[in-house]
Amino acid sequence: MFELELHPKWKKRLEEAKLTSVEALLQLDLQEKLEFLPGIGGGYYQVADDLRVFLYCDLQISWHRILRSFVMFQWPCSLSEREQRGIEMLHQAGFQIAEVMAWGNRKVLRLPRQGVLLLRALAGLPLPRFLRQELDEKVRRRTILAAEETLQALQEGGFFWPDCLPENFFVQADGSIALIHVHSVRRQRLNALQAQQQFEFFYSRL
């Protein structure tokens, strides 16, 4: 198994919770489990009353995925590593995003074979779930507008996010929008048509 690196800010809390190894993370009884691709998933876990986390697990990195990355002229990496890079990039750009608590990647000959990423879970709801629960039409419209403005800010900041699904816009307690599942985000300036297509993609799934 591979080593888990702890962010200094969260080292003490993770030690108290005995979550200092990859083995410990993989034994968590995760809630609200998600599967992004075969072998790639994650879920939530309540560490303490004031701390909920989200764990990404990428434990079956196939040779097909590695070869596909090379064909696309990209160096292969695990989904958890891409998520961590996306978080760091968007955090530096001023977007609201989850905090990285711990990470680990096992590589063979510099090629990724497994990866994990532990995040502090955001407090709030994915946009579609929020809209289903919110009865005030003004609040609903204001929240959708906030998500639209966030997507526009991404575009104006030079980011392309293929996974700009409504469920990846997270409505926080104060009504602000945070972003989740950002492993596909990359630096790319969009022309007017591409920007419009992104909004159409977002609206079609709202």
Regions found by a protein language model. Give the residues of each.
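Active-site acidic catalytic loop and adjacent metal/ATP-binding pocket
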Residues: 43-47, 55, 149-187
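Conserved kinase catalytic-core helix
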Residues: 80-81, 86-97, 128-162, 166-167
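Short acidic, glycine/proline-rich loop/turn micro-motifs
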Residues: 65-71, 129-133, 192
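C-lobe/activation-segment region of protein kinase-like
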Residues: 142, 172-206
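Juxta-kinase regulatory segment immediately upstream of eukaryotic protein kinase catalytic domains
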Residues: 1-34
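Active-site-proximal flexible loops/turns
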Residues: 63, 106, 127, 170-175, ...
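Short alpha-helix boundary/capping segments
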Residues: 75-78, 135, 139, 190, ...
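Conserved ATP-binding subdomain of kinase catalytic cores across diverse folds
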Residues: 22-125, 156
